[in-house]
């Protein structure tokens, strides 16, 4: 099925690309998410009329993500406290939601889905490097300092 991308889609293309995808992927994901429309003659003409608007919107989203990445880089590290044993292992774990809440408390708008924990939740005290995926092209690293209560 031919679709026109309205947003950048990883491993597929950028705004305005006409790509061929499986019909289920288009009907169940791309079209309902607003990331693509079917490539009919009317939609192609409509898209060409809106191309500048969509590209400007995509550029604005990218610049906002870069600004948030700069704020995260400026902050450098956040602290999260949790109960821990004498050996430094936590009673429980620090999840992506806890890290996102710490970043929000520091003044940076981040959702838990943007926090990427490579090896799962943090289970020990100390400093851990965590990736924050803000945009398809923008990632930021933040140091999470887990301290025992």
Swiss-Prot record:
Keyword Kinase belongs to the record: no
GO BP, one annotated term: translation
InterPro entries the record matches: Ribosomal_bL9 (IPR000244), Ribosomal_bL9/RNase_H1_N (IPR009027), Ribosomal_bL9_bac/chp (IPR020594), Ribosomal_bL9_C (IPR020069), Ribosomal_bL9_C_sf (IPR036791), Ribosomal_bL9_N (IPR020070), Ribosomal_bL9_N_sf (IPR036935)
GO cellular component, one term: ribonucleoprotein complex
Keyword Ribosomal protein belongs to the record: yes
Gene3D superfamilies (alphabetical): Ribosomal protein L9, C-terminal domain, Ribosomal protein L9, N-terminal domain
Any GO MF annotation of the entry: rRNA binding
UniProt keyword annotations, A-Z: Ribonucleoprotein, Ribosomal protein, RNA-binding, rRNA-binding
Primary role: Binds to the 23S rRNA.
HAMAP family listed in its UniProt record: Ribosomal_bL9
Family per record: Belongs to the bacterial ribosomal protein bL9 family.
Database matches in NCBIfam families: L9
Classification via PANTHER family: 50S RIBOSOMAL PROTEIN L9
Name of the molecule in the record: Large ribosomal subunit protein bL9
Taxonomic path: Bacteria, Pseudomonadati, Pseudomonadota, Gammaproteobacteria, Pasteurellales
Gene: rplI
């Amino acid at each position: 099925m031919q679709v026109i991308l309205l947003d950048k889609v990883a491993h597929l293309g950028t705004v305005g690309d006409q790509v061929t995808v499986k019909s289920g992927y288009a009907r169940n994901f791309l079209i309902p998410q607003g990331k693509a429309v079917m490539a009919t003659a009317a939609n192609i003409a409509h898209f060409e009329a809106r191309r500048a608007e969509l590209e400007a919107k995509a550029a604005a989203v990218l610049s906002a993500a870069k600004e948030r990445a700069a704020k995260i880089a400026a902050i450098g590290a956040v602290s999260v406290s949790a109960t821990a044993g004498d050996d430094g292992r936590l009673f429980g774990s620090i999840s992506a939601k806890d890290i996102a809440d710490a970043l929000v408390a520091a003044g940076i708008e981040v959702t838990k889905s943007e926090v990427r924990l490579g090896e799962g939740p943090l289970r020990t005290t100390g400093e851990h490097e965590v990736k924050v995926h803000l945009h398809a092209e923008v990632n930021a690293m933040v140091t999470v300092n887990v301290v025992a209560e």
